[in-house]
């Protein structure tokens, strides 16, 4: 699910989770998902990142809906937590304090926790925020495996459009309404993607992720070229002092 801030992405997720009632329209969720069928990974706040509990305790808390009114976790629930820690590669961190972990490790812990609640559907809200590039690639590798090998369905809100298009089966683009819904490979050719990738200012396209443009400095040769986005930009080559090397921006 992609879209600008305030477009309704998180609101839709909260509707799926039953945390908000729709003010209009109709939202239908399969019966088996209404109780223990959905695992949720919300955006982390600073307070959550500093949570003073062990990794095992955080993962086990995903079994709360299974535990009901019982004061203690059952052996089955502890086994589920252990299995999910092993699946996510965090067994060795079980007794470590959650707040001492890196951002990527914390995300693994929270996904293991979410898997304790369900094996059907994970809803992830901006899960890569604050992660470094290597941790982001590790994260996508992890959820790719969950989806393709363990058959866990994943709905993810993201601003990371490049990876979203590469990894997702389908893209839903919201802007208070549905601008696009369909296969990811069709999305990049849609008008919705064009608006998302570009801002218009006085009729001139301001390039973002899909376009590349150089700042004008002395000694530049300007050539108008058509970018992959379909817009025409002035691309520049900068001559490097002391040689004939040109740097394309």
Predicted features along the sequence, with ranges:
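Conserved ABC transporter NBD signature motif
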Residues: 25-38
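H-loop (His-switch) and adjacent beta-strand-loop-beta switch element
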Residues: 170-183
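ABC ATPase nucleotide-binding domains
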Residues: 185, 189-249
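Catalytic Walker B motif of ABC-type/P-loop ATPase nucleotide-binding domains
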Residues: 122-125
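Conserved ABC ATPase "signature" region
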Residues: 75-93
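Conserved ABC ATPase signature
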Residues: 97-101, 105
């Amino acid at each position: 699910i992609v879209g600008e801030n305030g477009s309704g992405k998180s609101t839709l997720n909260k509707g799926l989770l039953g945390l908000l009632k729709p003010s209009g329209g109709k939202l239908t969720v399969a019966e088996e998902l209404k109780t223990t069928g959905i695992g949720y990974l919300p955006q982390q706040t600073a307070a959550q990142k500093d949570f003073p509990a062990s990794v095992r305790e955080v993962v086990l808390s995903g079994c709360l809906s299974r535990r009901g009114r019982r004061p203690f976790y059952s052996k089955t629930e502890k086994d589920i937590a252990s299995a999910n820690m092993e699946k996510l590669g965090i067994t060795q961190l079980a007794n470590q304090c959650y707040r001492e972990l890196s951002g990527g490790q914390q995300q693994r812990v929270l996904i293991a926790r979410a898997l304790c609640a369900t094996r059907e559907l994970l809803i992830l809200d901006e899960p890569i925020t604050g992660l470094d590039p290597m941790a982001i690639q590790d994260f996508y590798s992890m959820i790719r495996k969950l989806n393709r090998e363990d058959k866990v369905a994943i709905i993810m809100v993201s601003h990371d459009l490049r990876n979203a298009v590469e990894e997702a089966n389908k893209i839903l683009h919201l802007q208070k309404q549905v601008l696009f819904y369909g296969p990811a490979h069709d999305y990049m050719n849609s008008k919705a993607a064009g608006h998302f990738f570009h801002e218009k200012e006085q009729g001139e396209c301001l390039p973002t992720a899909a376009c590349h443009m150089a700042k004008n400095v002395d000694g530049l040769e300007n050539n108008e070229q058509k970018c992959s986005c379909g817009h025409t930009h002035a691309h520049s080559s900068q001559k490097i002092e002391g040689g004939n090397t040109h740097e394309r921006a």
